[in-house]
């Protein structure tokens, strides 16, 4: 009964702020009706006023509405004027740095380690990043106005503004936003995204701050999921049990009322108006001293699972996470398209090097690429789990490889041959392939024709493997470490022989490229290059240390075996016979 009462209250939240509520009612409904003569005089005066307005302004709108008449002035409102001028100014590139654009609303602010992330509501229209500023409280200080670091936006998602890190414990806003400044939430304790999985009616929640150990299951009974618009009001939230907890990923039962609510919203999206709070989900610890993590996670429904589909749209897809790798993207996509990859999921971790322009130059009818904004730092494992869920409905197999890694088939087999061989074996859920790490190969400058033909000398022994997985075979916990996942009980992995398939990993490129690795690592449980821990790890460059200082012999390092296999294949298959150029 208590849960039902909570759910009834929760369902009423969906109508909060909608039209027709509050002090509405029919015209003259309160008190007794006026006499008929009085009504006639009132209506005569009313229409005389409308006629006078039409003469004065040159136009008048007569708007009818049920129950209660709604009057609209003949001239657009100040807000409509601002929106109209806003669109025109953006198109003309003439937005003042102090202009206020009514469409821009800050929904969330998160204090990341090196900057502040502002997430705008869907539909927020932004001019170029040089035409507005980040404001830090108190707003009357000229020293607390700074240019944004970058702006990212997608047609079907929120816009992201990356502001420089400001003073601690101050609210942040934008010079063109009409919403009030927002106090940033701290990144180290935050529920940052969530997915609704119709396959088992669960919600997958991604959270920082619970400090679960890598590669191991936590104790789910210690936690519960909390759904609601305001977690400070216990009567207005619904809780559900957590069924698995691992790393930064929690899976809990989706309450029936939440599923119904999400189906009622437009397109299944958890949308809100400017005066309402969104539906959020969080993680709460149970027992004495229980606490609820701050949350910005609005549950997003995955494509509805259809167990009757026997064949998926794509036999092979790829997930990757990258930051500022745009100059290598064309070669990576074109090459893998030629060998049989059909779909790409690119998780963009705060790139500011023009990745969208590069993708726009590629023929969308030939290359099925989805770019997903993933601003969360040190969260690669969570991003891969997120991608595996998104790819599950359309992809039979999904490879998890980096932008500097290229699948290579030294023998006569192809990618499709390998996949067909194991697709008929239902207990095989993961294909593991060895990686060969290539060095600078004597180069001091970036090879003009790409990495596959530019780097030809590598280490003799293979390093850690990478994986191609069946997303349906993954363990519900979605645990993944170094690009391979834990599988469901009864599912197995196989090691693919190096003569059949392997990965060329162009890991140690010319110093101009390699030094960018010192800016930070995306993996959650891997130390950054400048950290003084795990210096001897295989994730590091042997003998390099923690400082971005180029060794004198860098061009000659990591060169034990000359390997022209992939270079020869690329030159044979991709070279234009008329110009001698490669397509990238």
Swiss-Prot record:
Residues 16-28 have a biased composition (Gly residues). The chain crosses the membrane at residues 43-63. Keywords: Glycosyltransferase, Membrane, Transferase, Transmembrane, Transmembrane helix. Residues 1-33 are annotated as: Disordered. InterPro entries: Glyco_transf_92. Residues 314-525 form the GT92 domain. It comes from the Eukaryota. It is a single-pass membrane protein. GO terms for molecular function: glycosyltransferase activity. Residues 1-10 have a biased composition (Basic and acidic residues). It is found in: Membrane. One of its GO terms (biological process) is glycosylation. Its main location: membrane. Its EC number is 2.4.1.-. It holds the Pfam family Glyco_transf_92. GO terms for cellular component: cytoplasm; membrane. The keyword Transmembrane helix applies. Belongs to the glycosyltransferase 92 family. This is Glycosyltransferase family 92 protein Os08g0121900.
């Amino acid at each position: 009964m208590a849960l039902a009462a909570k759910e009834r209250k929760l369902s009423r939240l969906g109508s909060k702020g909608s039209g027709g509520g509050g002090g509405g009612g029919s015209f003259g409904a309160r008190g007794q009706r006026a006499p008929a003569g009085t009504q006639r005089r009132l209506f005569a005066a009313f229409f005389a006023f409308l006629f006078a307005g039409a003469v004065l302004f040159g136009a008048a709108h007569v708007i009818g509405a049920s129950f209660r008449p709604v009057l609209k002035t003949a001239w657009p409102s100040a807000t409509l004027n601002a929106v109209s001028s806003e669109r025109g100014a953006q198109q003309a590139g003439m937005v003042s740095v102090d202009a206020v654009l009514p469409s821009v609303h800050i929904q969330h602010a998160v204090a990341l380690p090196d900057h502040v992330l502002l997430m705008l509501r869907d539909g927020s229209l932004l001019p170029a990043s040089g035409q507005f500023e980040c404001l830090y409280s108190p707003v009357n200080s000229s020293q607390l106005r700074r240019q944004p670091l970058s702006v990212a936006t997608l047609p079907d998602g929120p816009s992201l503004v990356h502001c420089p890190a400001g003073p601690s414990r101050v609210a942040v806003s934008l010079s063109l936003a009409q919403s009030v400044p927002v106090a940033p939430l701290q990144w180290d304790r935050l529920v940052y995204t969530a997915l609704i999985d119709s396959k088992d009616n669960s919600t997958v929640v991604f959270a920082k701050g619970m400090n679960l150990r890598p590669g191991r299951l936590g104790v789910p009974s210690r936690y519960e999921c909390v759904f609601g618009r305001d977690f400070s009001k216990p009567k207005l939230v619904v809780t559900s049990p957590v069924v698995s907890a691992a790393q930064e990923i929690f899976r809990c039962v989706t309450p029936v009322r939440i599923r119904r609510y999400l189906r009622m919203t437009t397109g299944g999206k958890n949308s809100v108006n400017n005066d309402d709070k969104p539906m959020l989900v969080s993680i709460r610890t149970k027992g004495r001293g229980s606490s609820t993590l701050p949350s910005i996670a609005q549950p997003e429904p995955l494509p509805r699972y259809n167990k009757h589909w026997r064949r998926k749209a794509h036999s092979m897809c790829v997930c990757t996470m990258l930051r500022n790798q745009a100059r290598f993207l064309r070669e990576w996509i074109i090459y893998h398209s030629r060998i049989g990859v059909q779909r790409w999921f690119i998780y963009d971790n705060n790139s500011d090097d023009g990745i969208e322009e590069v993708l726009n130059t590629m023929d969308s009818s030939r290359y099925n690429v989805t770019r997903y904004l993933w601003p969360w730092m040190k969260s690669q494992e969570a991003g891969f789990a997120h991608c595996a869920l998104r790819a599950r409905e359309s992809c039979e197999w999904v490879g998890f490889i980096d932008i500097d890694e290229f699948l290579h088939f030294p023998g006569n087999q192809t990618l499709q041959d390998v996949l067909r061989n194991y697709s008929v074996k239902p207990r095989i859920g993961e294909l593991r392939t060895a990686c060969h790490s290539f060095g600078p190969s004597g180069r001091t400058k970036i090879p003009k024709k790409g990495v596959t033909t530019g780097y030809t000398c590598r280490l003799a022994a293979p390093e850690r493997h990478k994986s191609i997985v069946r997303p349906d075979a993954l363990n519900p916990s979605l645990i993944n470490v170094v690009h391979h996942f834990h599988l469901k009980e009864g599912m197995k992995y196989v090691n693919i022989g190096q003569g059949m398939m392997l990965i060329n990993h162009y890991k140690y490129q010319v110093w101009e490229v390699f030094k960018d690795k010192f800016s930070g690592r995306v993996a959650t449980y891997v130390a950054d290059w400048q950290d003084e821990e795990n210096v001897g790890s295989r994730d590091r460059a042997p003998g390099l240390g923690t400082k971005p200082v180029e060794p004198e012999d860098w061009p000659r390092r990591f060169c034990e075996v000359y390997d022209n296999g992939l270079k020869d294949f690329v030159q044979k298959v991709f070279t234009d016979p008329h110009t001698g150029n490669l397509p990238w």
